[in-house]
Every structure is written in C-alpha cells, then in structure tokens.
Amino acid sequence: MSQQGLEALLRPKSIAVIGASMKPHRAGYLMMRNLLAGGFNGPVLPVTPAWKAVLGVMAWPDIASLPFTPDLAILCTNASRNLALLDALGAKGCKTCIILSAPTSQHEELLACARHYKMRLLGPNSLGLLAPWQGLNASFSPVPIKQGKLAFISQSAAVSNTILDWAQQREMGFSYFIALGDSLDIDVDELLDYLARDSKTSAILLYLEQLSDARRFVSAARSASRNKPILVIKSGRSPAAQRLLNTSAGMDPAWDAAIQRAGLLRVQDTHELFSAVETLSHMRPLRGDRLMIISNGAAPAALALDELWSRNGKLATLSEETCLQLRQALPAHIDIANPLDLCDDASSEHYVKTLDILLASQDFDALMVIHSPSAAAPGTESAHALIETIKRHPRGKFVTLLTNWCGEFSSQEARRLFSEAGLPTYRTPEGTITAFMHMVEYRRNQKQLRETPALPSNLTSNTAEAHNLLQRAIAEGAASLDTHEVQPILHAYGLHTLPTWIASDSAEAVHIAEQIGYPVALKLRSPDIPHKSEVQGVMLYLRTASEVQQAANAIFDRVKMAWPQARIHGLLVQSMANRAGAQELRVVVEHDPVFGPLIMLGEGGVEWRPEEQAVVALPPLNMNLARYLVIQGIKQRKIRARSALRPLDIVGLSQLLVQVSNLIVDCPEIQRLDIHPLLASASEFTALDVTLDIAPFDGDNESRLAVRPYPHQLEEWVEMKNGDRCLFRPILPEDEPQLRQFIAQVTKEDLYYRYFSEINEFTHEDLANMTQIDYDREMAFVAVRRMDNAEEILGVTRAISDPDNVDAEFAVLVRSDLKGLGLGRRLMEKLIAYTRDHGLKRLNGITMPNNRGMVALARKLGFQVDIQLEEGIVGLTLNLAKCDES
C-alpha cells in the first residue's frame, strides 16, 4: 500500500534515459523519440558516452555527470549493466526507475539495491508507462494516446500493445497506461491506491496474470472500487494456461471470489474486455437494472433479448401513459412493447419521437438503441438525430444510453460520432447487452457490499476448546481426523453432526447397533484409504444384528484384498439419518496458494470438481456474504433451491456457513475440511461424514487470510466514572442500526463540531462506509453498553491511515448526554495505543476553536495544538514515537 516514489514515477518533473541512442530500433532511441514526441514539458536527460547529443538533446556521458538528480530514470541498456547503473542512480538520489529488461537471476539483487537507496522500481520487463495528461510517453509504444479518464494497468506487454492499438483507432483516451512487467517492486495494489485519489481517473481496467500479495490487492481494490468502477480480466484460468504463463495463479474460482469480495467486476475474454473499455470510458451511473430496447428490426432485437435472458437480465415495463404516447406518435402498424421494433422503414424522425417520449418517462434505467443499415434512415443521419436529441433533452445528460449501429463500413462514421459525443457504442447486439450486464453486475456487487448484515441468532463458538482439541491431536501425531474425532471440534462452533461411535470389530459394531437402535450405517476407518467408496467401505440401512455383522466382515475382507498394506482403525457406526425429503450438500474448505482458505459450497453425492460444481467465497463471512454465496449457488445451479418435499432454508444454511467461517478463521491448524454429505432437512443441518486435515501452525493467524478478520483481541471491558461497565471493541458491519440510533442521541452542535457542517440525516451508504471498514486500513472503536440482550453505542473513535502507514486522521464522538464520564478520553487512549502499536508515526485531526472540550482533551493527551483563527480550525497532531517514549 506504500505510495513512496509513485508521484515521481507517475508525475515526474525530470527524466533520465540511461543508454540513449541515435541508432533506430535501439531501446534508447525509441524511448527518447517517444518522450520528445509526447510533449513532456520537463527536462529529458539522455545518458550515453557514445553521443554528444541524442535527437537534438545534449547527452551526458554517465550518471555521475548529470547536472541534477532526475525524478525518474529509464534503463535502456544491456541487462548485464542493470545492477551497476541502479547503484549509480541510487547514489545520485534518483527516486524511481523503469527497468525495461532483466533476467530473473537479477531480481533479488535489484530489489535489495533499490531498497537500500529507498528507490522504487517499475518492472523489470516493463513496456513502460504513458500519462497523457502529463504529456508523458515513457514506453516503447509508438502509438500516441489521447487524454481520457480511464486508467489501464497490465501485467502483459502484448496485451498492452493490443489495447493501445485498439484505442488509437477509436480515438479513446486514458489517464494512465501502466505496464507492470514482473512487478518486482511496484505492484498493482499501490497503483490502485494512487489512482483511487487521482482526479483525472474515473474508472480503472486491470489485466492480471498473478498476484504477489492477495491481502494487499483485495484491500486496495475494495477501497478504490467504492468510488470508481474497476474491471478485471484475468488470464490463466486453466492449469495449462498457468504453465504457459509460468505462474502459480491458484484456483480460478478463488479469483472470482476475491474479485466479487472487493467489489470489482470480472470480464472473461478480450471481446468482453474491449466492450468493457468502451463502457468504462463513457459510462454514466446506473440507477437500476431495467433495460429498454429500441430497434429498426426484429432480428437484432431478438439477438439482444436472447443474450439478456442468458445473463439473467431484466426488461423494463412501459407504463400505460408511455404506451399511449407512443401509439399516438408512431405509425399504427408498430406494436408498442419492449423491445420496441420500429420496423425497417423507420426514419430518423421515428427514433427522435420515441426518444423524446421515453426520456420523459421513469420506466427504465438504461436505454439500448439498435440501428441496422437502412435506406429509410441512413446510419450517420440517425446517429446525428439521436445525439442532438440527447443533447437538447433535459434528462439527456442523466440517462444511461448504449448504442448499437450494426454493420461495419456503413456504420463507421456513426460510431465515430457517438465516441466524440461521449456515448458508448458497440458493434453487435450481444456485445451491447454484455456491456449493460457488466454495469448491472458492478452495481449489484457494490450494493451487496454495502448491505447491512443481519445479526445471526444463537451462534456459539468455544475457540479455546477447539484449539485444545486440535493441539492435542497434533501432539499425538494425527494429520487427519474423521467424523468421530472431529465431532467435539464442530460442536464447539455449534455445528451438528450425526452421533458416531467407533467399533474395533464386527462384534463391537453389533453391540453398538443394539444400543443405538436400527437401522445403522457402517463406515471404514483407515488413514490410507481417503475414498471409502473405492472398497465399498460404506454400508447403509443395516436393520439387524446379522446384517451388521456380515457388512462389517465384508468391509474388512474387501480392504485386505484390495489394500493389503492399509491400516484399519475399525469402523464408524452411526444411526441412519432420516433422509426423507432431505437435500444432500457439500461444504469444503481448501487452502489456495494465492488467496489462502476458501469456503466452497455444492451439491452432495457427486464427483467433486470445484471449478464446475461449487461456488466459492473467502472467509471471514457474515450473514450477508454467506447468504449471497447460497443465492449465487442457486442461480448458477450449483445447488438446488429445494428438495423433493421442501425448499432449502437459505437463512439456516447461511448461518452454518458463518459458523464454518468462524472455525476456519479462529483455527489456523485446519488445512482442509470436507463435510460430505451435509444433510439439509427443513431448518436442520447435520454433518453425516466429515474429514479434517490438520498441521502445526506457528505463524501469524491473520496473515494467511486474504481479508483481515474481526480483531477479537482488541476487545476490552472498561469502567466509566459512574461505575457502569462498557465494552470497547472494533466496529462491525452489523452495528449500522445501533450507530444510527447513537447519532440520533448526539446534539446538532456536537455533530457540527465533528463533521464541520449541519447534517440532517445520514444515508445508508454513509453509515455503511462507517461500519463496513477494512481493518487493514482504518480502525473504529465503539463503546457499547449491553442492556436487555441488546447493545447501545455510547461513543465512537476512528483513525484512517494513509497508504504508507505513516499518518492517520482521527475523530472521536461521544453521546451528548454522557459527557463528563471520561468516555472520550478512554476511547482516545485506546485509539492512540492501537495506532502506535500498528506502526503509525503521527495522529492528526482538526476541530473548531470553540470546541473547548476537545482542545483541552487533546492537550492532556500530549497533542500539539495549532489554533488557526483565520481559518476557523484547530490542528491537532500527536507524535506517536514521542508518545511511546513517554
């Protein structure tokens, strides 16, 4: 998340080209040519002993002779000289360097050298970067690009060149175009942090092949996507493609889960990528998912409709008033419906009349206009008419409009006109629908991330007991636990299993069956045979002692014949579960090499191929995220919405997934968990067969997760001056209703001191941003008092750190009727201790001069107080290092 050096890379004031050349096709020549042609208005310093000047610019023989230190250096020499040149640049004080080429064998030394001098590196093997707003073309690309508001970050030079060529033909602009190369130092997460605050960037497109730090990526992407749409294309979905790219990219469903969790949108191929670029370049915010389609032919509209249905899209329904107006304005033979087919003899006037009526209505959220080549309404003429209608209509600048002028030659000019007018345009009906559904899915992802999670009922967790059981099993040398052994661990987290007993032989199996009652099931116990079905190691519905004895002996005999070396640890004996009307599910937790633990949900009783048969989520899960996973599974037909007799209990299954998530987050010893089958019967969920793989773990528990979980260890009970006890804890997404109630009990004056303006009401989005925080980037502590099985918030303090984790902005607010109890001071002390322990250097805040209570508290806590009467503010700064010393 560090931003150190990025300003010098992306907005350099001076550039040195190391290895500049006058020989065409040399890297140093191409880089100099592009820098000078791009219009960069700072000094460009060619460095080469071979030439006195390069392209008319005075050259310098070596780095030491440069008249001043450049912000950015670009290495265009033979890779064998990289280390020596980087050392010389570091000694000169250069802040950033682009390395165009370097073998893998140099990577460690290059990175060590850069860190020694606190220099940032882009690359190696980077195409470079383009920043049109700075007139900067520090790349090999000969293609000039226009200024725009779309930023593109790519891990592939080939894809970068393709996009550049495509964008030039369409005169599409960019704010930044950055080719990362091998991402030895500067990586995608840091660039996302930078671009999220860049005023010239309104949308971001990523091409990714791999990640070096999934946690940092998810954190940065989630933060950036709250304000700007981000689309991702990820290659290497198959193992074969991963081998070709020489990456260890992990499971593809894990990427889907991470992208959704961060609020991004994934596109699947280059065709969708180009549509996405068009959409992001001209997109207006989407209000909903209702689409209205206008066409001058039934067939193109039908193609669009088929694609919309295949993607679970939604058509708008026209009101009676709108239908009446359309009937009066259009010829009688036109059927008023959606899609609205104006027929192949439709003139430009028909399009204009239709648009005027629809734009005045509130019946749709997006409008798709299709035009097929027609003598009655030439493409260019119709495009002009549409553009003028949009410009003059009062709602024109607010409507989400997508245009599809079919054909190639006859529609080129029309598409150019749409691009100039800032209207997205596509070549095919299907491509237009794809672009629309991108917008819908992005909006859904963002909305889903901001939903307030429900508080799950009756969740239990006994972390200490689970840890003790796992540590005892590991100490005894166990690597895998079966259903009987894992029962107490699951019970510690409120997960129900079918009662299970162990029998060492057939006689003991009969004895247990007599005790628990028939019918029963027998299951083989062997650490050497993971799949019992391979030896028919599971026998069901055994109704008599004779059947149990025969089945037990048969299992033992089959193992001796098929697996003579296998260790046999007896049999599991279970009562037969009541499967009438029940649904069999499967819940698996696996460790992904990139994203860590994954929670997978699918149907039971099938061969397990997660890429095809499961939906995947990253822990930790709350009720919202778990419910979204279940609904996603139903929509994608990975699980059924009902059994033969009853519907699936979505809330109950969501709660079970939250319990599994809590278990995985709390217990890093768990390497893999397989609950199969999980029997869903009405509101009851019972694990019939469970396998748990375990291993010692002595690292940082949280570091293995792609999303930082709720930090339980920061909870603390505090006694106020009046003797009441309250809990100081990190804020939770579920706190939104209590936070709204808390704010209602704060006076307008106190709110004005806190927010520097009069606020009548906080929206759901405001409160979601306050409660659904990324604990890696900010912290908010709430003081809560528990009364009658409910919690009320008494005070809140918050700190938001910068990406470099140096400074943090703080704020504190206490309920107005509870002042004088020391609550504000205790909350601030809690926040100061946290930020200091988190490695931050300074804590900064502002208040008003007449907020005397806050100013006095700040002085008592050691803050430097800077009263700026002319500005009407008081600056508060605490040096955390000095605070630590004191």
Swiss-Prot record:
Q: Which residues form a coiled coil?
A: none
**Which GO MF terms are attached to this record?**
ATP binding; metal ion binding; protein-lysine-acetyltransferase activity
The outcome of changing residue 780 to T/V is: Almost loss of activity. Decreases helical content of the protein
Q: Which organism is it from?
A: Salmonella typhimurium (strain LT2 / SGSC1412 / ATCC 700720)
Q: How is its activity regulated?
A: Exhibits positive cooperativity. It may be the result of acetyl-CoA binding to two distinct sites, or the result of subunit interactions.
The residues covered by the ATP-grasp domain are 487-523
Which Gene3D superfamilies does this chain map to?
3.40.630.30, ATP-grasp fold, A domain (3.30.1490.20), ATP-grasp fold, B domain (3.30.470.20), NAD(P)-binding Rossmann-like Domain (3.40.50.720), Succinyl-CoA synthetase domains (3.40.50.261)
List of residues binding ATP: 513-524
**Catalytically driven reaction(s):** L-lysyl-[protein] + acetyl-CoA = N(6)-acetyl-L-lysyl-[protein] + CoA + H(+)
Q: Which UniProt keywords apply?
A: Acyltransferase, ATP-binding, Nucleotide-binding, Transferase
Task: Kindly give the Pfam families that the UniProt entry links to this protein.
Answer: Acetyltransf_1, ATP-grasp_5, CoA_binding_2, Succ_CoA_lig
Protein name in UniProt: Peptidyl-lysine N-acetyltransferase Pat
